[in-house]
């Protein structure tokens, strides 16, 4: 690679985060524009945003088979993700899991801005990369990073193994 482009072992995760934010934003726009569009004649776009988000969210490759966890999925796909970060179906699968986390705590979207603050985190293991992200986040938005870590280590969405909620088998809504 040349110029300012940095090869990252965890680019696949960034791709999934971008897709998650896109899906989350589509859903937010649908809700917001339904009641308060920026211009009155734009209100008609709300259902189109919602339908598009639902169509994307409903794609079967975005969901785990019942009984599997994200942690298990990651263990099976770790090598291929690191070597080929643009595998759309794998990125979209993870994006759906991350979107579920964002929907539970919409105020934590700002945590994404703290990813990659430590330049040395690019070459760390994925676990250390996530821990670096967590430590860079201000305390009031660290919860999102912790939930992501929990997703990869235990497979749950809420940060506690006892109350694991894995988005499996189909759309969560």
Q: Which residue ranges define each predicted feature?
A:
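Second-shell loop/turn segments in exported
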Residues: 3-12, 84-85
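Post-HExxH zinc-binding segment in Zn-dependent metallohydrolases
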Residues: 9-58
């Amino acid at each position: 690679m040349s110029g300012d482009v940095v090869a990252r072992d965890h680019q696949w995760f960034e791709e999934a985060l971008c897709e998650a934010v896109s899906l989350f934003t589509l859903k937010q726009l649908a809700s917001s524009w339904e009641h308060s569009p920026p211009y009155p004649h734009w209100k008609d776009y709300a259902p189109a945003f919602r339908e598009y988000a639902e169509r994307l969210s409903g794609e079967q490759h975005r969901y785990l088979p019942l009984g599997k966890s994200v942690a298990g999925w990651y263990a099976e796909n770790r090598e291929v993700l690191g070597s080929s970060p643009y595998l759309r179906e794998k990125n979209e699968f993870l994006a759906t899991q991350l979107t579920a986390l964002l929907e539970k705590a919409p105020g934590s979207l700002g945590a994404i801005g703290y990813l990659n603050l430590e330049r040395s985190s690019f070459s760390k293991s994925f676990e250390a990369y996530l821990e670096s992200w967590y430590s860079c986040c201000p305390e009031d938005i660290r919860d999102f990073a912790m939930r992501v870590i929990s997703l990869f280590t235990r497979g749950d969405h809420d940060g506690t193994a006892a109350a694991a909620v894995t988005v499996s088998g189909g759309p969560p809504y």
